[in-house]
């Protein structure tokens, strides 16, 4: 059925359910799993009143974000290994979440994308919801959205 399944995670509870579902699907299909999280770049403000940080401070913050992202995909790997599913882990640094998901699926030759319908609350939910919509409308491979 599927050979390689990409699952996008942001660490939210619904996202964790999507990971579990993707792992089960990979196990049933004897497919490889690609666990992906997208980490934003530190925003640089060019507007008056914006707080400028030293490049070393920005690098430190981004490194922390990458560590957090790595922890998320490491958890995917741990869960997949328990089920005997081979997983490849990807932490992508991008401000364009949907594009990063689509690009990772293409790069790793995935034939299915699994993601949660939402995970965050408030403004982040609104923004990430639009990311999900972008993946749904721009992906050339099937997308499974879990609620």
Language-model region placement:
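Short, well-ordered secondary-structure micro-motifs
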Residues: 18, 45-48, 99-102, 125-126
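Structural beta-alpha unit
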Residues: 75-113
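Gly/Ser-rich helix-loop-strand patches that form or flank binding pockets
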Residues: 24, 106-147
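Histidine-centered beta-alpha loop that forms part of the nucleotide-sugar donor binding/catalytic region
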Residues: 10, 94, 117-120
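A short acidic, glycine-rich active-site loop
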Residues: 55-71
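Small/aliphatic-rich secondary-structure junction motif
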Residues: 3-55, 79-88
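Structural motif
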Residues: 36, 90-92, 146
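Absolute protein N-terminus
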Residues: 1-2, 147
């Amino acid at each position: 059925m599927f050979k390689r399944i990409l699952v996008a995670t942001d660490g939210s509870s619904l996202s964790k359910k999507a990971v579990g579902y993707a792992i089960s699907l990979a196990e049933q299909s004897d497919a490889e799993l690609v666990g992906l999280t997208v980490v934003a770049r530190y925003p640089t403000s060019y507007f008056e009143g914006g707080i400028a940080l030293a490049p070393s401070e920005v690098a430190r913050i981004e490194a922390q974000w990458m560590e957090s992202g790595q922890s998320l995909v490491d958890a995917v790997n741990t869960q997949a290994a328990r089920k005997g599913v081979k997983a490849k882990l990807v932490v992508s640094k991008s401000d364009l979440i949907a594009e990063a998901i689509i690009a990772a699926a293409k790069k790793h030759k995935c034939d299915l994308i699994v993601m949660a319908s939402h995970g965050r609350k408030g403004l982040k939910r609104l923004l990430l919801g639009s990311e999900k919509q972008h993946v749904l409308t721009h992906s050339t491979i099937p997308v499974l959205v879990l609620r």
